[in-house]
Amino acid sequence: MFMGEFRHSLDSKGRVIVPAKFRKGLGDNFVATRGLDNCIFVYPMNEWKVLEEKIRQLPLTKSDARAFSRFFLSGASECELDKQGRISLPSNLRDYAALQKDVVIIGVSNRVEIWSQEKWDNYQQQAESSFENIAEEIVDFDI
């Protein structure tokens, strides 16, 4: 399970250090793709295979299912860590997530997300202001 928030810098070659806490969970090979909210989703290979199978089962007759499949899968890239624990992010994903220099890497249960620091800070500020309302609407956990 991935959790936590880490701030790092993207180097001139589009590489970013993956927090040591996440490296073991991601394994040697993993998949990065366009995520929701203009961030990058990063999945360990076992989680990716489960997700890919669910996408494969979407009905081809529905245009929304085809659009989602195309968007999600066409942006996917198999990645690996280098010896320094960095991931080299493809330019299409960096452009999609508007990654410049400062990035935020967060753990979200079964995946890792990579955000531009500016977008993450804005998103977090909005989410904090409405967290109680969101919790009332979607959470029924007694926490």
From Swiss-Prot:
InterPro entries xrefs: MraZ, MraZ_C, MraZ_dom, MraZ_N, MraZ_sf, SpoVT-AbrB_dom, SpoVT-AbrB_sf
Taxonomic superkingdom: Bacteria
Signal sequence, renumbered to the chain: none
GO cellular component: cytoplasm; nucleoid
Compartment list: Cytoplasm, Nucleoid
GO molecular function, one term: transcription cis-regulatory region binding
UniProtKB keywords: Cytoplasm, DNA-binding, Repeat, Transcription, Transcription regulation
Keyword set includes Transcription: yes
CDD domains: MraZ_C, MraZ_N
GO BP annotations, alphabetical order: negative regulation of DNA-templated transcription initiation
Chief location bin: cytoplasm
Keyword Repeat (UniProt): yes
Residue ranges constituting the SpoVT-AbrB domain according to the UniProt record: 5-47, 76-119
Subunit structure: Forms oligomers.
Family as reported in the entry's similarity comment: Belongs to the MraZ family.
Protein name: Transcriptional regulator MraZ
Species per Swiss-Prot/TrEMBL record: Natranaerobius thermophilus (strain ATCC BAA-1301 / DSM 18059 / JW/NM-WN-LF)
Taxon lineage: Bacteria, Bacillati, Bacillota, Clostridia, Natranaerobiales
Gene that encodes it: mraZ
